[in-house]
Each structure stands twice: as structure tokens, then as C-alpha cells.
Design a protein with these regions (language model features):
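Core dinuclear metal-dependent hydrolase active-site scaffold
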Residues: 1-71, 127-162
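Cap/insert and terminal regions of metallo-dependent hydrolase folds
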Residues: 52-132
Length: 162
């Protein structure tokens, strides 16, 4: 847990004893106090589907289930093995996928992107470049800030050969 100006963060889960390396990655809740109100973001690591489903179902003795948030940084670059349990549970209004353009792993997986798209808007760094978020008073009936993702720097291309 820590703070820096208007930003607070809290590690919700980081399991160094996880049998799978990806499942040991930290899950961090970040809250930014904006002029339009607080914006919560769940920054997920590379936790895979089974561990994510157990977390969401409350089957962890070391962590509460993930909270509802405004923004979700999607697990494992949108890989298929990240699952959709956390995105469905947190009810984010914006899903961000951090992934390199033309990466050799084929991330994000089409099925993951399709599932996220059914839950709400998806911003991807491979398509949209480096992203920044802004929060403004908006038309949201729940009084929550309107969140917009903006491209700060376009995605770069990778060239091989002469």
C-alpha cells in the first residue's frame, strides 16, 4: 500500500508460492483522485484462468475477491489463458490491453478481445499506441467520471531485414 499525491495503490494479491510463475504476479488496485472524482484501475499481471477464477470465486484465503473498478488493465496481454473471470467480475467501463504490435506470441487472442468487447470498450496498445487516460464530469447516471483513453504516441512498427 502506498500513496503519491492524488494516487493510492494497494497490492490485492501476489502469491510467491503459486505453482505457476504467471499466477505469482501482482494484482494491484490503483485509485487516482481526479477533479471529476476517484478513478479506480485494477492492474493485473499474468495470472492465468484457473487462478483468476479461484480469486473471483473467493476461494483464496489470502485475498478478497477483486473489487469493481472503472478501468481494467487486462491480464497477460490479452492471452487466451488469462481467462475472462476477472473482466466479468470487476465491471470495468474501459478495458486496456498492453501488448506489443506484431508480437511473436499472437497476443491478444481474438476470443479474449471479442469477450472483452462484449463487456465494454477495449483500448489496445498494439493498435492505439501509448495510452493516457483522462477523467471528466460526464453523463454517467451513476455520477462516476467519464473516462477517455487518448493516444500519446502511436504504435511503432517492427521491421526485419534490409
Amino acid at each position: 500500500t502506498g500513496t503519491a499525491g492524488p494516487v493510492r495503490w494497494h497490492v490485492l494479491l501476489a502469491d510467491a508460492r503459486a505453482p505457476e510463475e504467471n499466477d505469482a504476479s501482482a494484482q494491484v488496485l490503483v485509485t487516482v483522485e481526479s477533479g471529476a472524482g476517484p478513478v479506480t484501475t485494477l492492474v493485473t499481471g499474468d495470472m492465468e484462468e484457473d487462478a483468476s477464477a479461484a480469486w473471483v470465486a473467493g476461494h483464496r484465503s489470502d485475498a478478497a475477491a477483486p473489487p469493481r473498478v472503472d478501468v481494467l488493465k487486462v491480464a497477460h496481454h490479452g492471452a487466451r489463458n488469462g481467462g475472462t473471470a476477472v473482466p466479468r467480475a470487476v465491471g470495468a467501463r474501459l478495458h486496456m490491453v498492453s501488448v506489443g504490435a506484431d508480437n511473436p506470441y499472437g497476443h491478444p487472442h481474438r476470443a479474449t478481445v471479442d469477450a472483452l468487447g462484449r463487456l465494454g470498450p477495449v483500448a489496445r496498445t498494439d493498435l492505439h499506441g501509448t495510452l493516457a487516460l483522462t477523467a471528466a464530469d460526464g453523463p454517467n447516471s451513476d455520477g462516476a467520471p467519464e473516462i477517455t483513453a487518448h493516444t500519446v504516441r502511436p504504435p511503432s512498427s517492427v521491421r526485419t531485414g534490409p
